[in-house]
């Protein structure tokens, strides 16, 4: 039986679409980070961008991307739970786990 890699890499997109909006994802060098220093990622619903710090390891970058993606989806749905950081963090973490542990179905 073939070994299944449980730690697959999640590709961070340059852009994707939600509700007809193009969402741009930028991986930003720390020297150009314009957000609070404690933040490692930021969703901006005004200009439809997700910024991620480039000093993160692969797994942390994936988790932060998924966290900001959850904010983006919830904001596009106009759902107030987007302001609940604990919910968004848990959802983003579980989403990252699911996306990096898929075992593909043969067709």
Regions found by a protein language model. Name each.
Residues 5-61, 75-94, 99:
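Active-site scaffold of zinc-dependent metalloenzymes
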Residues 63-75:
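Active-site recognition of the HExxH zinc-binding catalytic motif
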């Amino acid at each position: 039986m073939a070994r299944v890699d449980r730690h697959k890499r999640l590709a961070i997109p340059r852009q994707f679409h939600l509700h007809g909006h193009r969402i741009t994802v930028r991986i930003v060098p720390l020297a150009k980070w314009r957000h609070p220093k404690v933040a490692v990622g930021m969703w901006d619903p005004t200009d439809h961008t997700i910024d991620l710090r480039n000093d993160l390891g692969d797994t942390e970058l994936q988790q932060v991307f998924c966290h900001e993606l959850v904010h983006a989806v919830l904001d596009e749905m106009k759902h107030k739970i987007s302001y609940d950081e604990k919910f968004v963090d848990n959802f983003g973490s579980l989403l990252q786990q699911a996306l990096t542990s898929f075992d593909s179905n043969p067709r």
